[in-house]
């Protein structure tokens, strides 16, 4: 039987104009879903109808922030810089590029356990795997063949209903290693907020911290969430402010400011020199849909295969097909769980070694590098 692979275009900057006007029926549907949910409730296992799903898995969303970009290869640039301070600036720039626009009222699929996503873009190879379903924990390993860069994510989120908004805290680790320089950059993930009142919207918020123990440099970035007033003034919408500093003395070296969906600058606090370090229009616009380069090598566990029928139903507005296909995916997962329980087997991830301490998860890739994928971003 031929594999059905359904790949969709990553959400680009220019696509936002199509999602700015939220239809009233979607708002009513969202509010009706939450009418029996108490504030403070954990929404981790909350079931959504296909009409409220993006045509992609959460694994694909994680993968896209690494392999989906237009223009300059910002990840490789982190390693190409000669001086430690320049590498930290490049790391800040790359991190900002991973912030992508969000669509209010729509969420990706919750990946099934064992689901994978494997895509390449030039010298960057990305492999993600769902290492747990309850709770939903995702692992991602990416390697840059040319610049010897290693990226590791082990993330899980806890969405909570707060009455006027949904607060999604992303936990876990995000580590980038510049192996040519023997440097490790540790960083966290901002919160995701979906607000209903006083104004509807979905945005990133909170504090981002980047640390490099080897160079003694650090960075802190504050994402200013959309406030009620900013809806009218436009001043704080997607604003980002922060600094690069020496960790030991807290001496500030650069002041970071701008808007992550537009332009971000870095000001040298000693010389006053200002430079543009990031332009969103040159990096997260005009993103290309990945293509299948080798169908035979596409895994049955690939996100685009697992959710292919569901995504096709959503894209074509065939909601009955999408509902049936989603039920099939979920029933297969339940059946797989029943079989494992009956045989006393526990799930073992294929690509990662996993450790769990209480509520904290950690993972290590089983292979030092990620091979080229059968799915690629076209040049």
From Swiss-Prot:
Keyword Calcium among record annotations: no
Keyword line: Lipid transport, Lipid-binding, Transport
Tissue: Expressed in flowers.
GO biological process assignments: lipid transport
Molecular functions (GO terms): lipid binding
Biological role: May be involved in the transport of sterols.
Record family assignment: Belongs to the OSBP family.
Protein name per the record: Oxysterol-binding protein-related protein 4C
Organism whose genome encodes this protein: Arabidopsis thaliana (Mouse-ear cress)
Lineage: Eukaryota, Viridiplantae, Streptophyta, Embryophyta, Tracheophyta
């Amino acid at each position: 039987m031929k594999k059905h692979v359904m790949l969709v275009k990553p959400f680009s900057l220019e696509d936002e104009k199509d999602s700015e006007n939220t239809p009233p029926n979607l708002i009513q549907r969202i509010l009706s879903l939450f009418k029996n949910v108490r504030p403070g409730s954990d929404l981790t296992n909350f079931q959504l109808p296909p009409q409220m799903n993006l045509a992609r898995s959460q694994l694909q969303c994680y993968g896209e922030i690494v392999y989906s970009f237009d223009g300059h290869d910002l990840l490789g640039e982190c390693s190409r810089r000669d001086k430690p301070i320049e590498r930290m600036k490049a790391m800040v720039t790359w991190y900002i590029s991973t912030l992508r626009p969000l669509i209010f009222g729509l969420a990706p699929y919750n990946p099934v356990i064992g689901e994978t996503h494997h895509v390449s873009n030039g010298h960057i190879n990305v492999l993600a795997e769902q290492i747990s379903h309850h709770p939903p924990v995702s692992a991602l390993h990416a390697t840059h063949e040319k610049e010897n860069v290693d990226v590791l994510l082990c993330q899980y989120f806890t969405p909570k209903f707060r009455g006027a908004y949904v607060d999604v805290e992303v936990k876990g680790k995000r580590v980038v290693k510049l192996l040519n320089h023997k440097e490790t950059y540790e960083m966290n993930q901002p919160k995701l907020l979906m607000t209903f009142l006083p104004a509807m919207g979905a945005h990133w918020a909170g504090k981002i911290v980047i640390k490099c123990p080897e160079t003694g440099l650090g960075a802190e970035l504050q994402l200013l969430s959309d406030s009620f007033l900013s809806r009218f003034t436009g001043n704080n919408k997607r604003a980002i402010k922060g600094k690069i500093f020496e960790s030991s003395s807290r001496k500030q070296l650069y002041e970071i400011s701008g808007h992550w969906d537009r332009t971000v600058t870095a000001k040298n606090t000693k010389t006053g020199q200002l430079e543009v370090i990031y332009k969103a229009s040159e990096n997260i616009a005009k993103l290309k849909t990945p293509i299948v380069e080798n169908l035979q090598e596409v895994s049955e566990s690939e996100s685009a295969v697992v959710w292919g029928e569901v995504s096709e139903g959503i894209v074509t507005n065939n909601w009955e097909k999408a509902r049936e296909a989603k039920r099939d995916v979920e029933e297969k997962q339940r059946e797989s769980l029943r079989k494992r329980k009956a045989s006393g087997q526990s799930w073992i991830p294929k690509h990662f070694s996993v450790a769990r301490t209480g509520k904290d998860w950690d993972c290590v890739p089983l292979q030092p590098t990620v091979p080229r994928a059968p799915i690629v971003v076209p040049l």
